[in-house]
């Protein structure tokens, strides 16, 4: 099997980032081997229907990962905090398992997705934001391991705030539904580094297509960079509901139904994410504006 015909092992292919990467690779003619825990699930079957090969494995089982990575030209890596007790330590453990498995299998390229600002976060976790230090430390620690692992080629993708979090079905910003308006601790003038998840897949596919050009690239990825007032205007147009950018206290947001996971938003008022669209454009990456994303994904919900 030549390198060009070898598959890319995609972690999280049934999720947002891995799914976007699997679709982008398949569209470009690259074979995809999707790591799944249960190939019988509807989500796994949907990935298979796109043309991906399913391989059973678990990020907590290094041997299963080594088997899954055999013969792969690259690995796309994504992990989330372990919600079953290990928290951010579990996220790091899973990343280490995947990195070590890929090295043991002789995979030459590793593309990992992290988060904007990881590794540049010392100021972000000072004072009232110290509770976020474990989150950023885990992301930065995984990045360090990727750099030091010895892959022939590696790339770090560091995306900003997902546009997908602006869907009406997501309680982070619409806990009361569209009619209840936006609920956020972000100030109207705060600019968000927004990312369309499909653009993460576009970057990953570009890195696989040109591993030497993307070797060592640490891309602070944003598809758009808008204030909350501008975001509200775009959403209003697509949803057909007049929305404004609120200026809420934490107490007001809590009373409006914002879940606890939304509290970290306020950090971005003081420490914006460094991701910017011009970084991806400099690499020739086509991007999706919020207006384009909203037109494609929100109009049917209006």
Residue ranges of each PLM-predicted region?
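Oxidoreductase cofactor-interface core, primarily capturing Rossmann-like NAD(P)-dependent enzymes
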Residues: 2-46, 60-63, 67-92, 100-110, ...
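Cofactor-binding loops of NAD(P)H-dependent oxidoreductases
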Residues: 57
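Short beta-strand-to-loop elements that line the ligand-binding cleft
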Residues: 244-247
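Generic hydrophobic, helix-prone segments enriched in Leu/Val/Ile
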Residues: 47-49, 182, 261-266
